[in-house]
Amino acid sequence: NDTLRKAELGDTSLVPQAEKVLDQLNRTIDTPRKMWEPAMVGAYYAVPDVIAGRPMSMRQQITTQDEVSPITVLVVTTSSAGIAAETLAKRGTVILALVMALSRVRPVTLQALCCVDGYKDGTGETIITSEINTHPLDLATACYVLTSAGFARRLTYGLATELNHFRGGWPKGFTYSAGGGSYYDKLIPRLVTDPKRCLLIEAARLNDALLVNPTEWLNNQITKFTTNEEEMV
């Protein structure tokens, strides 16, 4: 069917909309990384420097701010039935713009997440991850997965039903009215090896900030992400 075809081949019809949003975003995105520098005291000796009698013959690790640190972007595509397909499409174009911006300056890993209930395995939870090629960024697939209600509600919900008896609810431990913050905090370490450099975009809501003011949301996410890393490192 059309959903399966586009899931395989992608769909670029909304890429121009994402590019319009991207045109309004003009900032450099920095994240810290670890590097070694010469020092009088440090973790180990640089043998050539010792032989040469250089005073800065040891190496110490420092944190620098640059544009090479990899970022993992997790996008929850699950949504309440009250969220219209048009709203999901608009939301997806803004998220695509963010991914496009990040991928221009550093390695990015992009995954779409289906987070629903499930009763076959007794956990009350089904997580389906869909990793999208970002080296280089597969615009067609990213655009379709991020903007399509069909991908989320037909394909991933169908898989969840088949694999783990999805019954139409949110996963165990998730409270929609509370925003799901604590659930996501516990989910991130289960999915990525470096939670400090992970940006999770939560399930769609009618009052999403990214829908009200896309440019402001993009800038806020980038600022928040960078600030969090500076505090955690």
Give residue spans per PLM region.
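Acidic, low-complexity intrinsically disordered regions
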Residues: N1-T72, T77-V233
